[in-house]
Design a protein with these regions (language model features):
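A short beta-strand-loop structural module common to alpha/beta enzyme folds
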Residues: 54-64, 211-219
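A short, glycine/small-residue-rich beta-strand->loop->alpha-helix junction that serves as a flexible
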Residues: 28-40
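Acidic donor-binding loop of glycosyltransferase active sites
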Residues: 228-234
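A short, active-site helix/loop in glycosyltransferases that binds the activated sugar's phosphate group
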Residues: 105-107, 128-130, 141-163, 198
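Conserved catalytic-core segment of nucleotide-activated headgroup transferases in glycan assembly
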Residues: 37-40, 44, 151-226
Length: 234
């Protein structure tokens, strides 16, 4: 092993020990709309940031909207870097954490000389952008963080040569019950808004005597609006 290589290796080890290595988290631009999966990523990044690690939010376009309209302003204090038009600084001691939806990005960064980790929150999206017959390990992603033991068991059956760890999403203290009785409101949150409307209309048709009950679609609300309405609901 030559002197130059030894020097680079020692520098990488030093950066890891001193928490100088970069930890990139790729996020989707929700254009100001609330999305639970993005909140989870920001929570992870901010926790590392608070503990002295060099956590960086990575997004695709330069006109990134951010999350301050629906999450706490503190999350925008994290360093943010766009992929578009910039050469990301990547070293062997760095880490890149990519959501399961971004199979095409995994392919693009497969040659990067850094640690690569998949963050899988929804198994529905695993095959969305992966080429047929391709697994994460073929792109150098040998580790995966997922959100439940059940999902871990499912992933282990289909993604070989990958190690899995479970980190359960946190729930903020704002999700607490009110001491006073709830109002006759039923809060509904579905992935597809059409499912919400089907549920509401079907309920009123089947139980016309309960038309005094109000339904509230919880999509697109900020965290504080969401928790406030949820506290008032059945």
């Amino acid at each position: 092993m030559n002197t130059e290589l030894i020097t680079k290796l020692e520098l990488s080890i030093s950066n890891l020990k001193e928490k100088k290595s970069r930890i990139y988290f790729l996020v989707q631009d929700t254009k100001g709309n609330a999305k639970a999966s993005i909140r989870v990523i920001y929570e992870m990044a901010y926790h590392l940031f608070e503990n002295g690690y060099n956590a960086i939010i990575m997004h695709e376009q330069t006109d990134y909207k951010g999350v301050s309209s629906w999450l706490d302003e503190k999350y925008m204090s994290l360093p943010h870097k766009p992929i578009e038009g910039q050469n990301l600084e990547i070293s062997p001691e760095d880490f890149m954490i990519i959501p399961e939806l971004y199979g095409h990005v995994m392919e693009q960064v497969s040659k990067f000389p850094c640690g690569k980790i998949v963050l899988c929150q929804s198994y529905d999206y695993i095959m969305e952008t992966l080429s047929p017959g391709t697994s994460w390990s073929q792109y150098g992603f040998l580790k995966c963080i997922t959100t439940s033991e059940e999902q871990k068991k499912y992933l282990e059956k289909i993604m070989k040569n990958v190690s899995f760890d479970v980190i359960t999403p946190t729930i903020s203290n704002s999700f607490e019950k009110k001491p006073i009785p709830a109002k006759p409101i039923v809060s509904v949150h579905t992935r597809d808004q059409r499912d919400t409307m089907k549920l509401i209309k079907s309920f009123y048709l089947k139980y016309p005597q309960f038309r005094w009950i109000t339904f509230r679609d919880m999509r697109g609300l900020s965290e504080w609006e969401f928790t406030s309405i949820l506290k008032d609901s059945f």
